[in-house]
Design a protein with these regions (language model features):
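Iron-sulfur (Fe-S) cluster-binding modules
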Residues: 1-52
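FNR/FR-type flavoprotein reductase catalytic core
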Residues: 2-14, 130-290, 294
Length: 364
């Protein structure tokens, strides 16, 4: 059975029809080289908060409370939005204390003309806290185009959806895609949370395919839980998303069960492997700006650059959104997620999950 992927975009509003010829005219390559797009975007924002040459801006239609610490923000993007597939995410940009900050959030719902972000407020979350306390219906939010490959294939749909905590957000979008397509296969959906009160989308989680396991013991996954609710889990292709503890436990279970059906996953929160401290300092040089700093530590390059007073572009900080990706011209880095070393020149690396193992030159 072929399942729908991209949803149709809505008809543009009168305002968008009027501004679109201007936008496309100004985006001629020659004009791009003459204009500072940032300044033009700022000018257009002053005329209308949804107007931009390059940025997707989204009107906040409504804000829905899901749990005590989770809200859903329903958005209508402007004419630059290219659509999305269930399971993908966007980067949300906000200005705080004079700096533009970016975080990656999954799309929990995609309908013609609207998308929804379901965001849990993190205890120390600068951006999530700002969105929860400040963002209201009628505001305008800057987002990226949809990104990510945690999407359903046209064939071989999943037989098991497994999530915990806020990992339910992309998984819920995948489930809705299946339901909207008329999928009549044998689907099971197991979600784990600390309590019923912590269950995101409680009002939408009816149906015979859904099993909710609430546990007071840290909301942790166990093999017994899976075996109890889904006895034939080994035979089910599985889509998985959740915090690091869930990801590690499930990946460990699948690794010890070679006959298990395929597992597809997206991680919420990076499980970084510690790199060994260096015996002597190494130099990290930025070839374009001329900036440089020395380090003997094993922290990601992004954190060390910020500690040295350098402001670098970044987003999720966990290796997902690739906002901090740059080209390594020379030197060796270690991927703190996989432990792999990369010494080849002119390779793309993500600063938030890369630690220097030698002198480095970065194209920044």
């Amino acid at each position: 059975m072929t399942m729908p992927t991209d949803l149709p975009l809505p008809a543009p509003t009168l305002t968008e029809r009027l501004i679109r010829p201007l936008v496309h005219g100004l985006r001629h390559p020659v004009v791009d080289n003459l204009l500072r797009l940032g300044a033009v975007n700022d000018t257009l924002r002053g005329l209308h908060p949804m107007w931009s040459l390059t940025e997707v801006r989204a009107h906040v239609l409504r804000v829905e409370d899901e749990t005590a610490d989770t809200k859903t923000f329903v958005l209508r993007p402007n004419a630059l939005w290219r659509g999305a597939r269930p399971g993908q995410h966007v980067r949300v940009q906000v200005e705080l204390d004079g700096r533009r900050r970016s975080r990656a959030y999954s799309l929990s719902r995609i309908t013609p003309g609207e998308v929804a972000l379901t965001i849990k407020r993190q205890p120390q979350g600068l951006v999530s806290g700002h969105l929860h306390s400040q963002l209201r219906a009628g505001d305008v939010l800057t987002i990226s185009q949809a990104q990510g490959d945690f999407v359903l294939p046209a064939a071989l749909p999943p037989k098991l959806l497994l999530s915990a905590g806020s990992g339910i957000t992309p998984v819920m979008a995948l489930r809705q895609q299946l339901l909207d397509s008329g999928y009549a296969g044998d689907l099971r959906f197991l979600h784990i949370s600390r309590s019923r009160a912590d269950l995101i989308f409680a009002r939408r989680l009816g149906g015979p395919d859904v099993q909710h396991h609430a546990t007071a013991v840290n909301g942790r996954f166990s093999t017994d839980t899976l075996q109890t609710w889904v006895p034939d889990w080994q035979e089910r292709s599985t889509w998985l998303c959740g915090p690091a503890a869930l990801m590690d436990a499930v990946h460990g279970l699948w690794a010890s069960t070679p006959a298990a059906a395929p597992l597809h996953s997206e991680r919420f929160g990076a499980a970084l492997r510690p790199a060994q401290p260096l015996g002597s300092p190494v130099q990290v040089r930025f070839s374009r700006s001329g900036a440089q700093f020395s380090t003997t530590g094993s922290a990601p390059r992004l954190l060390q650059a910020e500690a040295a007073g350098l402001a670098l572009k970044h987003g999720c900080r966990i290796g997902i959104c690739r906002a901090c990706q740059c080209t390594k011209r020379s030197g060796t880095v270690q991927n703190l997620q996989t432990g792999e070393l990369c010494s080849a020149p002119d390779q793309a690396i993500r600063l938030c999950i890369s630690a220097a193992r030698s002198d480095l030159t970065l194209d920044l």
